[in-house]
A protein has these predicted regions:
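Glycine-enriched, solvent-exposed interface loops adjoining structured elements
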Residues: 1-201
Length: 201
């Protein structure tokens, strides 16, 4: 079960991370007016279950990032959206009387310690973000030297139902590598490549 948990988690993250590369690719191509075939709409639907909004904790002078953060969307105060800038941009902005940050036109810098908002703002700040999928756990109890499934400690996949085949193929490929079966790995990789070609066509 432990190997399955590792394979399952890796496969889920591979599929999840691919969504963002695909969005970038499909943003460069004209959209599709067919309601159920527009790839950007389908990708947004797949990511929707991972979108969160959270009030951030303030530990002077930083707003602490959510632990499960994968990609930041926006930060919002009661005055509206806060614009992200680099440290260098902030140094230039604060010197300009017209561009200097105000409560209604705040800016923030993303640092390893958290988000630094200018001007200093200690009220509620909402973070809109995409979270990481939870780690997969095939929960089990060992009874008479046999691992028996335990639903109370298990964490299931969180991907869109349409990803079931991709998930199986990716887990199969990882298992093929682990048991050193090149045929199983090659079959799974060929199937994965076929799926990718169909999606990108």
């Amino acid at each position: 079960p432990q190997e399955f948990n590792l394979f399952a988690d890796q496969a889920q993250m591979d599929i999840f991370e691919q969504y963002f590369y695909d969005i970038n690719q499909f943003n460069r191509v004209p959209g599709n007016s067919t309601e159920y075939a527009d790839m950007l709409t389908l990708l947004e639907e797949k990511i929707a279950i991972f979108k969160n909004i959270k009030l951030l904790n303030f530990v002077d002078p930083y707003y602490i990032k959510p632990n499960e953060l994968y990609r930041l969307g926006t930060l919002e105060t009661g005055f509206g959206e806060v614009e992200q800038v680099t440290h260098k941009e902030y140094l230039n902005i604060k010197l300009s009387p017209l561009a200097r940050p105000t409560l209604k036109r705040a800016v923030f810098i993303d640092t390893p310690q958290g988000y630094r908002i200018y001007p200093t703002f200690t009220n509620n700040v909402q973070c809109h973000y995409v979270r990481k999928p939870r780690k997969i756990n095939w929960g089990y109890n060992v009874i008479n030297d046999t691992a028996l499934y335990d639903a109370t400690t298990s964490i299931d996949f969180q991907l869109h139902p349409s990803e079931e085949n991709n998930l199986i193929v990716k887990i199969l490929a990882l298992a093929g590598i682990a048991i050193k079966d090149p045929a199983m790995y090659q079959i799974a990789t060929a199937e994965d490549n076929k799926n990718i070609q169909q999606e990108k066509a």
